[in-house]
Amino acid sequence: MPRTDDDSWEITESVGATALGVAAARAAETESENPLISDPFARVFLDAAGDGMWNWFAAPNLPAQIAEAEPDLKPRMQGMVDYMAARTAFFDNFFLAATHAGVRQVVILAAGLDSRAWRLPFEDGTTVYELDQPRVLEFKATTLAEHGARPTCHLVSVPVDLRHDWPAALRQAGFDAHAPSAWSAEGLLPFLPAAAQQLLFERVQTLAAPGSRIAVEAPGPDFIDEAARERQRQTMQRVRDLMADLEPDRDIPDVQDLWYFEEREDVGDWLGRHGWDVTVTPAPELMARYDRRPPHDIEDAIPQTRFVAAQRTERTRPDR
């Protein structure tokens, strides 16, 4: 279903369902022979959400009819598991390095089913602010509480739509804009229109004191490439048609319907112009760093993203 300006969602629908797909990839990596990351809560979320296409990433085998008709699908899905593992490790290491360096405020934008507040060994005195749709945060908190999970930090949930006045909600929740903070935008930007992305970083700029850090998964220059999008859409449509024959009542959403394919400013360039020291790593390079590689013989096997890490150095004080 196409996006609207004020749409909202449960965890099993629309944008929420994509968080389950990511959790399934983390579960698959966690349960693999040589896992790069460990997320013991990913499987908990999947079990709580019930059956859905998101479980394909965490299942050992695809339905035989689909595997035979689409032989590239299994290696393509493994490529995405490897991509998600490298992505997760990148953000894990970013937050641990920031808190080890003395940052005690962590802000996770569009937190989804991110479980870092429960699984990372944050330094004493760290506060983690999670921002997302109210029903998504409620599902996560309820599910983890039912399994006896306890945060490893001071956790503050901020139920707010990032298209609304989230800076005010963050401040009201106790965030101190005059102390350094560490921010993440993981799996977020494609779901925002270009203007909303611009506003997001302008707002972060007003809240991030000198010494703050930010990590971003950013669309690469080929994000709006029409040919690549069409290839991906055709592959997805074939899978949907096959799945409709197997399970007529199950709809498989196309993530492209949830993304905004618009020209947008390069994140690294924007941060660099606004007083941040920036490092940009293309996705294949990041995966290689963690000894993971996309399938070499499958086109468009992983998102052509860039991973941006930056630290604010200029001395302009944030807005009051």
Swiss-Prot record:
The keyword Methyltransferase applies. One of its GO terms (molecular function) is methyltransferase activity. Keywords: Methyltransferase, S-adenosyl-L-methionine, Transferase. The keyword Ligase does not apply. Belongs to the UPF0677 family. NCBIfam families: mthyl_TIGR00027. This is Putative S-adenosyl-L-methionine-dependent methyltransferase MAP_4078. It comes from Mycolicibacterium paratuberculosis (strain ATCC BAA-968 / K-10) (Mycobacterium paratuberculosis).
